Regions:
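Short, glycine-/small- and polar/acidic-enriched structural segments
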Residues: 24-156, 161-165, 170-175, 179-186, ...
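Secondary-structure end/capping motifs
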Residues: 223-305
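Pocket-lining segment of extracytoplasmic ligand-binding domains
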Residues: 88-89, 168-260
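Hinge/cleft segment of the Venus flytrap/periplasmic-binding protein
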Residues: 296-298, 302-322
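C-terminal motif of bacterial Sec signal peptides marking the signal peptidase cleavage site
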Residues: 14-17
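Bacterial signal peptide processing site
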Residues: 19-21
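Sec-dependent signal peptide recognition
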Residues: 2-8
Length: 322
């Protein structure tokens, strides 16, 4: 009997040894393109890398930075698969035949506004009549957001002067070179208040709903790389929630990705907090409103930036947030 038991044990061990070693889940390497340069507002993606959130979904992400128009061409041609892009860039690109598509909106509120010193008494959009407004240039989200706000208030280009000042909004305003400046809500207003200035801020989002930044891929990925796209969307959602729940942790992680970010920079910490207020943290597909895309398309057509109307509903997919 003992001999039979011994033989049975030997057989079990032999069978166990013959089993193939458990395989590690396949890792897909992708590049996630972010615009401009490393910035605290990209904290969720730094968190997703450092905390292994992308890895959890079988994805190894490398970050790259560059000009939005150049990057969207790479994604549209399927030379690369993912980027963070503005909603207007998605629409403009699709109108030119690039098959890019938003799969997850990042912002619930359009992140642009108009800031002025309290002494200028610009408390509503109609107060901009006769004023000089500084902005980086006649392009991008600043320009589009301002024109949308002005048009909604019944103003035309003849009612104000737009002055291209580069990214010097804070200095241009406090030295009274201009009456108001177009800003990112989470950036320049924080700097101005930190320097002790009392300001008024007109939010574009309070006037009308426009689509902001999104996770963007291409139609080939949506149809042929469903699991990968779902993984990127799920990882982004989780990273946003983790960052919003612990901004101090996210800030500390961001220091590994942003050169010269100080250990304790109160302005940059506040920029992160203000950014979080603008994010879309919910995944309810009802949050993806076609109206936001249609409104943006109307603005682009009115400005002459788009030459033809497209089907706005085809610019985004909510299949990965359901």
């Amino acid at each position: 009997m003992k001999r039979l038991i011994f033989l049975a044990l030997i057989l079990c061990l032999a069978l166990t040894a013959c089993k193939p070693a458990s395989q590690e889940p396949a890792i897909t390497k992708v590049t996630l393109n972010l615009t401009y340069i490393p910035n605290i507002q990209f904290a969720p993606f730094y968190v997703a890398i450092e905390k292994g959130i992308f890895a959890k979904y079988g994805i190894e992400v490398s970050l790259a930075y560059g000009n939005e128009a150049d990057l969207v061409a790479l994604v549209g041609s399927d030379n690369q698969q993912f980027m963070i892009a503005s909603g207007e860039q998605v629409l403009l690109s699709r109108a030119q035949g690039l098959p890019v598509i938003s799969v997850r909106e990042w912002y619930k509120d359009y992140p642009v506004g108009v800031a002025s010193l309290k002494t200028s008494q610009i408390s509503q959009a109609t107060d901009l009549r006769g004023k000089v407004i500084g902005l980086p240039g006649l392009y991008g989200a600043n320009y589009i957001g301002f024109e949308a706000l002005a048009a909604h208030a019944g103003l035309t280009d003849a009612d104000y002067e737009l002055r291209s000042i580069g990214f010097t909004q804070v200095e241009a305003l406090v030295t009274e070179q201009v009456d108001a400046v177009v800003v990112y809500l989470a950036n320049e207003p924080v700097q101005l208040r930190a320097r002790g200035y009392e300001i008024d801020v007109l939010r574009v989002a309070d006037a009308l709903s426009l689509v902001g930044n999104c996770l963007v891929t291409n139609e080939k990925s949506v149809s042929d790389r469903i699991e990968l796209v779902q993984g990127m969307v799920s990882a982004m959602q989780e990273a946003l929630a983790v960052t919003a729940a612990d901004p101090d942790m996210a800030y500390e992680i961001s220091r590994k990705f942003i050169e010269n970010l100080a250990e304790d920079d109160p302005i940059q910490k506040q920029v992160l907090l203000e950014s979080i207020k603008l994010w879309q943290l919910e995944t309810d597909p009802a949050d993806v409103e076609v109206t936001r895309w249609e409104n943006m398309q109307t603005v682009l057509l009115d400005l002459g930036l788009m030459k033809k109307q497209i089907e706005a509903r085809e610019a985004f997919s909510d299949a990965f947030t359901k």
